[in-house]
């Protein structure tokens, strides 16, 4: 019991319409590409001033995994953040009056083999390699330094540029290469490229997608809290402190545990669907979720493989069942806290809600344990039951 109280105290402390696009060879944009807009919060890793405005920028999936975020002020200064999946080489975005690569100016970014972030402006005088001139171009970059950042599997290029006139629709060139530029900054030939026409006058393109994703996150969180934060802990409490009500405690325990398992399974399924849509960089939350699915499945299978009370194996089964249950509840609580902290729409509501559930559960454990030690509850004889005592036809956890 002391171990469980410590686990929950630890968890409590931890808790403290798309713009118009046209292209000559743009691939079909699926839901997974669209939801790259919401995979990461740019304010978490981009420096100011990009971090101050990036979360409110219109977000447009353009081509393959290229995603464009932008904002423009009254002085025609545009803040642009372009991102794409990255392994090696370089990625770039260029601007051209006619949409042609020759004569365009481009911002190219990459992470060197030594892990250094590089970003340069290039002027494309022609199609030959020596005609792609580094540190030249017609883009009027502002005093704010351009930056390039690698976060998870995505690379982000951010810069500010001033255009002479406000043009709602602009030709944007996108390209990438898996080969690094030379030490002198000379670009290698691109592996693929495309040109798109972006309507920068539209600023509400991603609302419907974000709303859908936010709803799915809410469902995922509710299922996880109901399953791992409420039903399964209550089932464990019933198994430990209601055994003087035999066999009622057993049927209640089984009912709560199986219902909690169903809710937990639903949370995992919704989580997998969310991950496939938005590809977030959450290895800890995702890994613990899969780990919990394995543990909870083992608990269900253990129920059907429960040996008779008189057999020698029953003691070892009890140990297994109890400790797997305790470990599952601990990691379930930790993963709920991680999910709330990483949710971009979490707010105080989730923290207060789960904080209340966690506090009530912890208080119930403490009060009931005091009664159990005094012999008021916990066994038919009103005495503290021996360690791992089980009903002949039952299974317990925690």
Swiss-Prot record:
Note on cofactor: Binds 2 heme b groups non-covalently.
Signal peptide boundaries: 1-23
Membrane topology: Multi-pass membrane protein
Ranges for domain DOMON: 64-177
Recorded superkingdom: Eukaryota
Binding site for heme b 1: 220, 285
GO-annotated molecular function: metal ion binding
Compartment(s) of residence: Membrane
Cited Gene3D superfamilies: 1.20.120.1770
A single cellular component GO annotation: membrane
Protein purpose: May act as a catecholamine-responsive trans-membrane electron transporter.
Domain notes: DOMON domain could bind catecholamines and thereby could regulate the cytochrome b561 domain function. DOMON domain could bind one heme b.
Name of the protein in question: Cytochrome b561 and DOMON domain-containing protein At3g61750
Organism the protein comes from: Arabidopsis thaliana (Mouse-ear cress)
């Amino acid at each position: 019991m002391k171990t469980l109280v410590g686990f929950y105290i630890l968890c409590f402390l931890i808790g403290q319409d798309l713009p118009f696009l046209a292209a000559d060879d743009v691939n079909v944009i699926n839901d997974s590409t669209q939801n790259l807009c919401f995979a990461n919060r740019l304010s978490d890793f981009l420096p100011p001033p990009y971090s101050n405005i990036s979360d409110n920028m219109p977000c447009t999936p353009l081509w393959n995994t290229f995603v464009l975020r932008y904002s423009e002020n009254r002085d025609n200064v545009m803040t642009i953040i372009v991102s794409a999946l990255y392994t090696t080489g370089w990625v770039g975005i260029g601007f051209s009056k006619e949409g042609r690569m020759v004569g365009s100016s481009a911002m190219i970014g990459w992470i060197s083999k030594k892990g250094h972030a590089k970003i340069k402006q290039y002027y494309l005088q022609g199609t030959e390699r020596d005609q792609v001139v580094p540190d030249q171009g017609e883009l009027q970059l502002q005093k704010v330094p351009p930056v390039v950042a690698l976060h998870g599997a995505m690379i982000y290029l951010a810069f500010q540029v001033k255009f002479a006139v406000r043009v709602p629709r602009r030709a944007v060139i996108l390209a990438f290469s898996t080969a690094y530029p030379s030490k002198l900054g000379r670009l290698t030939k691109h592996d693929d490229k495309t040109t798109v026409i972006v309507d920068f006058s539209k600023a509400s393109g991603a609302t419907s997608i974000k709303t859908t994703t936010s709803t799915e996150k809410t469902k995922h969180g509710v299922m996880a809290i109901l399953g791992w934060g409420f039903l399964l802990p209550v089932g464990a409490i019933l198994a430990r402190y209601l055994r003087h009500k035999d066999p009622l405690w057993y049927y209640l325990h089984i009912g709560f545990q199986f219902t909690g398992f169903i809710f937990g399974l639903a949370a995992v399924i919704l989580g997998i669907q969310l991950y496939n849509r938005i590809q977030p960089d959450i290895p800890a939350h995702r890994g613990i979720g899969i780990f919990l699915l394995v543990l909870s499945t083992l608990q269900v299978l253990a129920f059907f493989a429960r040996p008779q009370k008189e057999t020698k194996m029953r003691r070892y089964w009890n140990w297994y069942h109890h400790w797997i249950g305790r470990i599952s509840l601990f990691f379930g609580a930790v993963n709920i806290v991680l999910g709330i902290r990483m949710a971009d729409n979490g707010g105080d509501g989730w923290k207060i809600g789960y904080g209340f559930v966690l506090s009530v559960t912890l208080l119930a454990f403490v009060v009931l344990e005091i009664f159990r030690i005094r012999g008021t509850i916990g066994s038919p004889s009103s005495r503290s039951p021996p360690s791992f005592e089980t009903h002949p036809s039952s299974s317990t956890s925690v």
